[in-house]
Amino acid sequence: MFAKGKGSAVPSDGQAREKLALYVYEYLLHVGAQKSAQTFLSEIRWEKNITLGEPPGFLHSWWCVFWDLYCAAPERRDTCEHSSEAKAFHDYSAAAAPSPVLGNIPPNDGMPGGPIPPGFFQGPPGSQPSPHAQPPPHNPSSMMGPHSQPFMSPRYAGGPRPPIRMGNQPPGGVPGTQPLLPNSMDPTRQQGHPNMGGSMQRMNPPRGMGPMGPGPQNYGSGMRPPPNSLGPAMPGINMGPGAGRPWPNPNSANSIPYSSSSPGTYVGPPGGGGPPGTPIMPSPADSTNSSDNIYTMINPVPPGGSRSNFPMGPGSDGPMGGMGGMEPHHMNGSLGSGDIDGLPKNSPNNISGISNPPGTPRDDGELGGNFLHSFQNDNYSPSMTMSV
């Protein structure tokens, strides 16, 4: 009779009723109740052929096994007779390792009382597919906002470059800051490599400012500016946090990354943010750190402390008095004091002597006088400020 339902994994209710009726009839015959067996078949209107199994029959055998296990349960084993096999079955089941889903539920107790918690058989939270499938966050930058940048400071040379921002968009990680130079001085508008020589166009300075000298110095990543390159002629600049990047050198056709020219035109980076040809003071279209590009070179960071914004304006100690106590590594960035020794300094404008090798300490007197060496226009006013 079971052959009729081979196609279904679980027998239907009709098949279960037929099997139970067959086992009842078989049991009645094996116990000697033949009249009762025939009456049973006639009352249920059984019309199919019946094949009897071996005595005592399936129903009797099944009942004996069930009853033995039922009596050997821990709560009934002291009052009911049971076999040692049934007792061992319960003891083994209780001592077995708990299931990761059902825990220590005894075999005869089934599911615990009370409502089943949500997701009981669905694995840990979040494992179910969402009706609106979303890709996994395999790109870390996708979790950092629409204008994200790699989590690496521009002080580290060769690090990932932040994305370009447009127009008046605020910087991604520094709220409330503004660019240090207007768009007219943005060197990124005129792309090119320092080695291209005269093919680069000349940058236009902002109004009220003279030309930036015959040869803006071209420092590679990690290079330091000469000692006299920080002068008293930028009185109102509030330097924001961060590190700057070098200007391209439109007048230099050599491939040496350190070509020292007029010492008054560069406020250099302490580690460079990238290859030569990127701006020292980017406009809003450059990096998200536009207002914090030349800060760590000037503002020493105390150990364990935070930076403090201080103006580079004149003070009681002179135009750049606050710079006197600088340590050499703040002008250095990631390279040591001897990293650029021996490199040629072959710009024709190298006319002002450098009293100290790059990266060595100096006093306040060395910081004055030469910053606007090549500023030929007197229209520059000390009241012109570039505030953060």
Swiss-Prot record:
Keywords: Acetylation, DNA-binding, Methylation, Nucleus, Phosphoprotein, Transcription, Transcription regulation. PROSITE patterns: LISH. Disulfide bonds: none annotated. One of its GO terms (molecular function) is transcription coactivator activity. The modification Phosphoserine is found at S347, S352, S355, S381, S387. Residues 200-209, 250-268, 346-357 have a biased composition (Low complexity). Residues 126-139, 272-282 have a biased composition (Pro residues). Residues 285-296, 373-388 have a biased composition (Polar residues). SMART domains: LisH. Residues 315-325 have a biased composition (Gly residues). The modification Phosphothreonine is found at T360. GO terms for cellular component: nucleus; protein-containing complex; transcription regulator complex. The modification Asymmetric dimethylarginine is found at R155, R161, R165. The keyword Kinase does not apply. InterPro entries: LisH, SSDP_DNA-bd. It is found in: Nucleus. Residues 101-388 are annotated as: Disordered. It comes from the Eukaryota. Pfam families: SSDP. Residues 16-48 form the LisH domain. The modification N-acetylmethionine is found at M1. GO terms for biological process: cell differentiation; head development; head morphogenesis; hematopoietic progenitor cell differentiation; mesendoderm development; midbrain-hindbrain boundary initiation; positive regulation of anterior head development; positive regulation of cell population proliferation. The keyword Nucleus applies. May be involved in transcription regulation of the alpha 2(I) collagen gene where it binds to the single-stranded polypyrimidine sequences in the promoter region. This is Single-stranded DNA-binding protein 3. The gene is Ssbp3.
